[in-house]
């Protein structure tokens, strides 16, 4: 088997995790207590969904997941929620005091007390796998636990499981909406280790997803539940090929191979289509070409940056439902002819497509319409650099005055770590600039004539 272990860290990671496991259970027909009436091979078997669920002898399906937080409230919601019987109690790890939005507390003082326990649980899950494929790590980089403990865990996973791939789903701070004053510090410090220790990181941004919910689903005041259900559709589409049998299946390692041209350039944009409410879906024809086009719309991107300001290096389209390769090829050919969607000149093909025949499921009582087909796009675009330069700018404004730095130093960090992380991100911005401008030097003169 090619098992995947999911690790959910901090409030954002856990709440996105709840939405994901709720959706996985629906897709596979697994009940809230872990029983699966449709499963023919009780207590094992080689079903495709066993990549994400392990089975006990009594026919109970247990997610291969760990939830970690430094304070108990969010995890207690899982312990008392609808799916409380789904998870093994040992998989829900919570501490007593939180990281107080402080990277240093999550990474050094409080995080290091809990990290060995987490690794111990992860080791148990890994020993339970026959062919562990890699880890999916869910966290946010603005808070203290997601950023601090998140990067600590990633560093330790690199040591213990060097060759296994690590896919990150990371919530980055939004341009306008801020949840804490020290977000820029936490994000920069945390990205410094994401650069080193994840193989692919998908950037998510609450504001971008808010706007999608408002615009496409007509929800006036979206809640985190609305956002997370949308994010879970993206993550479900990415992992569908691991959990179901399809025509063109895509492995976790394949994302890496197809999307990452240079090891550091591994921050992805994601988008999903169709995001549409039930009232509207009834009246619209959502063909493969249409959903493919809308996945490329700048407004569909789940992070606040405009792909028209950059160039695409590679892009992965995961279709599910009633889709045939012929339609996909036609849709991709159309996209290639569009002037607004520019690829770097050293990557002429740039598309990886996957198809899965399992149609997308929706949570009953949720906002999304049940549709016949959907597409999820993960793309590597140079425009992602906008996310980093925004955070770097805010970091510089605060760090110039050394504002709030004493809270970090007091928890055992050194000022040198701030400047080291900031320099690493400056280098990353430079890397993105160079990647987008590779072979353009000689041709600057001719470009004006084309339009």
Curated annotation (Swiss-Prot):
Other information: Dinitroaniline herbicides (such as trifluralin and oryzalin) are antimicrotubule drugs that bind to tubulins and inhibit polymerization. Prolonged use of these chemicals has resulted in the selection of resistant (R) and intermediately resistant (I) biotypes.
Transmembrane spans: none
CDD domains assigned: alpha_tubulin
Species this protein is from: Eleusine indica (Goosegrass)
Residues found modified as N6-acetyllysine: 40
Cofactor: Mg(2+)
Annotated gene: TUBA1
Site positions (Involved in polymerization): 451
Name the record gives this protein: Tubulin alpha-1 chain
Catalytic residue list: 254
Family stated for the protein in its record: Belongs to the tubulin family.
Gene Ontology MF terms in the entry: GTP binding; hydrolase activity; metal ion binding; structural constituent of cytoskeleton
Subcellular location, principal: cytoplasm
EC number(s) on file: 3.6.5.-
Top-level EC class: hydrolase
